[in-house]
C-alpha cells in the first residue's frame, strides 16, 4: 500500500512538472533584444508628474508622465546623444538632465527652459554631474572639472539666473561624498590604497576641514542625520567586516 502511494505521488509530481514546463512561454531573440530600457524616475515637487529616461525611440530620451491622466509626452528628441533625466527643479519645475556629446563620456548638465535645452556646464573637455539642491532649493549643486581636468570642484548654480559659484576648490584629488542638509558641511574621501581610505569633514563657512578617519583602515561615508548633528560612516578598522559609526559635528 505504501509503495502504491509513493508511486502515485511521484506520478503526480512528474505530471505537475511537465505541465509547468509546457506552460513556459518562449521568446525569440528578436523579441528579447527589442525590449525597452528605462531609468531615472523622478517626481515633480507636487507629485503630479514623473520624468524618466527610455530608449524606446532607439536612443535614450526624456519622457514625462502626467500622473493624473496617465498621459505621456516625449520631452526631447535626440537622434545621437543619450539624454538621462536628473529630476525637476523644485522651485521652477523645469527639467534637469545630463548628456555627453558624441559618446565622449563627458557628461554636461542641462535645463529645459521655454522649450530649449541650456547647457549649465559648458566647456569642450568639461565633465559634470548633478549633486543635489541647496536647502532653500534655489540653487543646484554640480560637480565639475571645468577649472582643471584632473580634479572635480563643487559649484552651485542659481536656478533663476543660471549663474554659478564655486563652493569647494579641489586641488588634492578628493572624492566628494555628500553635503549636509543645512549646506554647511561637505564630506570628502581620499583613496590611498585598497586597504586605506580616509574621510574628511569640510566646513564650507570657515574653509577648514578635520579628519574623521583617525586610524589606518577603510572609511566609507554614508550620510548626515536629519538635523545635521551627526555624520554616519562605515569602517573596517580592527575588524573583518564593516560596521556603522557616527561622528558628532
Language model features with spans:
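Sec-dependent signal peptide recognition
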Residues: 2-8
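C-terminal motif of bacterial Sec signal peptides marking the signal peptidase cleavage site
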Residues: 15-16
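A short beta-strand motif characteristic of beta-propeller blades
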Residues: 27-33, 71-77, 116-122, 163-168, ...
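Conserved beta-propeller blade repeats
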Residues: 35-53, 80-98, 109, 124-143, ...
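Short loop/turn segments that connect beta-strands within beta-propeller blades
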Residues: 66-70, 112-116, 158-162, 203-207, ...
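Preference for long, solvent-exposed alpha-helical segments and helix-linker "stalks"
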Residues: 103, 117, 125, 149-150
Amino acid at each position: 500500500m505504501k509503495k502504491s502511494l509513493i508511486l502515485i505521488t511521484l506520478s503526480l509530481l512528474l505530471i505537475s512538472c511537465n505541465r509547468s514546463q509546457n506552460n513556459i512561454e518562449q521568446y525569440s531573440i528578436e523579441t528579447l533584444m527589442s525590449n525597452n530600457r528605462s531609468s531615472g524616475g523622478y517626481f515633480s515637487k507636487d507629485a503630479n508628474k514623473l520624468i524618466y529616461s527610455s530608449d524606446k525611440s532607439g536612443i535614450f530620451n526624456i519622457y514625462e508622465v502626467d500622473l493624473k491622466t496617465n498621459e505621456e509626452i516625449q520631452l526631447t528628441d535626440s537622434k545621437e546623444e543619450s539624454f538621462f533625466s536628473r529630476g525637476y527643479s523644485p522651485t521652477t519645475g523645469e527639467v534637469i538632465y545630463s548628456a555627453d556629446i558624441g559618446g565622449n563620456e563627458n557628461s554636461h548638465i542641462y535645463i529645459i527652459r521655454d522649450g530649449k535645452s541650456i547647457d549649465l556646464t559648458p566647456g569642450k573637455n568639461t565633465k559634470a554631474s548633478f549633486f543635489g539642491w541647496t536647502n532653500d532649493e534655489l540653487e543646484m549643486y554640480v560637480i565639475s572639472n571645468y577649472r582643471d581636468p584632473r580634479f572635480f570642484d563643487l559649484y552651485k548654480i542659481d536656478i533663476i539666473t543660471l549663474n554659478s559659484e564655486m563652493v569647494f576648490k579641489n586641488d588634492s584629488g578628493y572624492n566628494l561624498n555628500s553635503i549636509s542638509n543645512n549646506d554647511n558641511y561637505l564630506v570628502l574621501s581620499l583613496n590611498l590604497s585598497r586597504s586605506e581610505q580616509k574621510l574628511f569633514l569640510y566646513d564650507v563657512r570657515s574653509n577648514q576641514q578635520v579628519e574623521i578617519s583617525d586610524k589606518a583602515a577603510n572609511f566609507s561615508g554614508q550620510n548626515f542625520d536629519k538635523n545635521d548633528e551627526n555624520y554616519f560612516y562605515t569602517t573596517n578598522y580592527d575588524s573583518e567586516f564593516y560596521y556603522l559609526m557616527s561622528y558628532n559635528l
